[in-house]
Design a protein with these regions (language model features):
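Short, contiguous strand/loop micro-motifs
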Residues: 78-79, 162-163, 193-194
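Hydrophobic alpha-helical transmembrane segments of integral membrane proteins
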Residues: 11-12, 215
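Structural alpha/beta surface segment adjacent to cysteine/selenocysteine redox centers
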Residues: 83-168
Length: 248
């Protein structure tokens, strides 16, 4: 799998039949450290509801200055990413609540549907981005079903002007109705999907970061900027504990 490069002449050729196949990282790394004491959130706040946008344009859940920073490079059309979302989030929330661990979600865009969803989950408040991503992963198979059922409309979207193209993709995939039922109005979505400058930024950030960090698969995880050779929560949690996110 190669990162998707944005083009105003993009061909809508997402490999839908293969999109649920698991992908994973291929580099190694481990960290070891002393126990890190919990870090209190500022008065009137809690880390589980704290979201910031990083310099890398990722969405960080938790303490932005957490000593342990877990980063996921994810695709919204990756079945393994959907599985991680379903199995890992309760555990991640527990670690984030301590202030010791933050969880940052970054995009590794692999196809036009992925880029469309990546745009839509960023369309509202930053606090909702990861939640909307999780909901989109839960709906992944239905999204593929919609595109396959509406393939003519999906392909026709590629011939639309740039500011209409991703609206066409979203309509063919059933995403406008899906996100409208989850708090993003249809007009709000269309405005975001017509913003080709923002869309190009998402795709270009994905491509440049993948090249700079040598990331070629999703999901890929970094812990304190060190690439991990695992991609499941059952493998990641022990690494967090070894790095200091554990009790005495």
């Amino acid at each position: 799998m190669k990162p998707f490069r944005f083009s105003l002449k993009l061909a809508l050729t997402a490999p839908l039949a293969l999109a649920l196949a698991a992908c994973g990282g291929d580099a190694g790394g481990d960290l070891a450290g002393d126990v890190i004491a919990p870090i209190a959130a500022p008065d009137g706040t809690n880390w589980g509801e704290t979201v910031t946008v990083s310099d890398a344009d990722g969405y960080v859940l938790g303490n932005p200055d957490a000593p342990l920073k877990l980063i996921e490079y994810a695709s919204h059309t990756c079945g393994a990413c959907a599985n991680f979302s379903a199995t890992a989030k309760p555990g991640i929330q527990e670690y984030v609540a301590t202030g010791v661990v933050s969880f940052e979600q970054r995009n590794l865009v692999r196809d036009p549907i992925d880029l469309t969803i990546a745009t839509l989950v960023r369309c509202g408040a930053k606090e909702n981005m990861q939640t909307l991503s999780d909901l989109a992963w839960q709906n992944l198979q239905e999204t593929f079903n919609n595109v396959n059922a509406n393939n003519a409309a999906y392909q026709a979207a590629g011939e639309l002007p740039p500011e209409q193209r991703f609206i066409g993709i979203a309509q063919a995939a059933g995403l406008i109705d899906f996100f409208a039922a989850r708090g993003l109005s249809a007009d709000q979505q269309r405005a975001c999907l017509a913003d080709t400058t923002t869309i190009e930024g998402i795709a270009n950030n994905s491509s440049s970061q993948a090249n700079d960090l040598g990331i070629q698969a999703t999901p890929t995880f970094l812990l304190n900027d060190r690439k991990l050779d695992v991609n499941s929560w059952s493998e990641i949690e022990p690494l967090l504990q070894r790095a200091g996110a554990r009790q005495e």
